[in-house]
A protein has these predicted regions:
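Hydrophobic beta-strand segment of the Class I
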Residues: 1
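Conserved segment of the helicase C-terminal RecA-like domain
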Residues: 6-61
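Flexible glycine-/small-residue-rich
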Residues: 32-35, 45, 152, 180, ...
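Terminal, basic amphipathic appendages of nucleotide-handling enzymes
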Residues: 52, 64, 133, 145, ...
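C-terminal accessory/connector segments of nucleic-acid motor ATPases
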Residues: 54-171, 175-182, 187-188, 264-273, ...
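Short secondary-structure junctions
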Residues: 111-115, 257-260, 288-297
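A generic structural motif
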Residues: 120, 193-198, 293-314
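Short amphipathic alpha-helix segments
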Residues: 170, 243-251, 272-292
Length: 369
């Protein structure tokens, strides 16, 4: 198996590795070809994490309220009608339907379901929203991860998560960092999940880029371990050994053994937290609005205003906080139209929360450079 650059998870790597070595007399094999310093470090981090025996746990998305709405509508479509008082019997205690009473009330209130005495059946709003092609969309619950495609003209730049589209980025007050460059957002089509951008030539190239799609806390921490000297348990080419040493030298000021580094420049403070985008966004959600609204994050860093005080992170309460998601991003969540707007926003926000990772960051010592 030849891998250009690196997957975003150990499980993805294992899935690809498992396709090799199937013939008699052959062994599993993989060759990683990194195209630049960032992807070399990412590949080394992945293989270091794999060498520890770590594999991402299989965890279902939390609070799938939009799926509960789909299931109730599909039941009405399947049976023609169902009794409002006994709908629970159809799912035998499935956790997917936890909290579905609130969803059911909304479906009836908004005429997705119509009532006739104790019975519920498909209503006019459901026919309008989902009735095309004999309710084909309603019959499928397969949902891909919510990603936004970024384009410049007809050229595709890459993909990002909704977490990257903060209010300041959407309003073009701050650039979107992607593919080693800064971009100004021109328009967003939330239904098609497309972000149109133009390059911000005043910013130049971004020196240190991070994958804009969320990576796990463990994956990003593995890169930090490599910068601190850990080597992946694989055979490296001479060029890879030399380049990895160069990367460690170039980025030695971004990591310390027993804490985090805060790098202050003339215009901003950059916290090299290496916690992953979800943990960083969760941390920002717990900070005061006047701090978080001007901050941006990626998988490796959180960028604050120049005068940010690291003491604000000490003992920060993360209970109940959800990462800030652009309200329009809810439109990209399948079946979200069948949920109250606030419930749909919370459903999406809970997919991007990482309180465990954020909690580890609040307990770390911060070294200010």
């Amino acid at each position: 198996m030849i891998q250009l650059d690196s997957p975003r998870s150990v499980s993805s790597f294992l899935q690809r590795l498992g396709r090799t070595g199937r013939r008699a007399g052959s062994v599993r094999n993989a060759l990683f070809l990194a195209t630049d310093n960032d992807t070399l470090l990412r590949a080394a981090g992945l293989l270091h994490l794999w060498g520890t025996g770590f594999v991402e746990p299989v965890v279902p998305p939390p609070s799938p309220r939009h799926i509960a709405a789909q299931q109730l509508l599909a039941l009405a479509l399947q049976e023609g009608r169902f009794a409002r008082a006994s709908w629970h019997e159809w799912w035998a205690g499935s956790h997917v339907m936890d909290g579905a009473d609130e969803v059911l009330d909304y479906l009836v209130e908004q005429e997705f379901l119509a009532a006739d005495g104790p019975w519920l059946f498909i209503g006019p709003r459901a026919e309008k929203e989902f009735g095309r092609r004999h309710f084909l969309e309603l019959l499928s619950t397969f949902i891909a991860d919510l990603e936004m495609k970024v384009i410049e003209g007809r050229r595709e730049i890459g993909s990002i998560a909704p977490l990257s589209l903060t209010a300041q980025v959407i309003e073009s007050r701050k650039p979107l960092l992607l593919a080693g460059r800064a971009w100004t957002v021109e328009s967003i089509d939330w239904d098609r999940r497309v972000v149109a951008v133009r390059e911000d030539l005043t910013k130049g190239r971004v020196r240190w880029g991070s994958e804009p799609m969320p990576e796990s806390f463990e994956m990003v921490r593995a890169r930090r371990d490599v910068l601190l000297g850990a080597d992946p348990p694989v055979r490296l080419s001479q060029r890879a050994v030399a380049r990895l040493a160069e990367v460690r030298t170039l980025r030695r000021d971004q990591v310390v053994e027993d804490g985090l580094v805060m790098d202050r420049s003339e215009k901003l403070s950059v916290l090299w937290a290496f916690g992953g985008l979800k943990a960083h966004a969760t941390l920002l959600a717990a900070l005061p609005d006047e701090v978080s609204e001007s901050a941006t994050a990626d998988n490796e860093t959180i960028r604050f205003d120049l005068h940010f005080e690291a003491d604000l992170l000490d003992g920060l309460s993360l209970e109940g906080v959800l990462p800030a998601i652009a309200p329009q991003a809810v439109d990209g969540l399948k079946f979200s139209v069948a949920l109250p707007r606030g419930v749909a926003a919370a459903t999406l926000g809970e997919r991007f929360v990482d309180r465990l990772g954020a909690g580890r960051l609040t307990r770390a010592q911060v070294q200010v450079e």
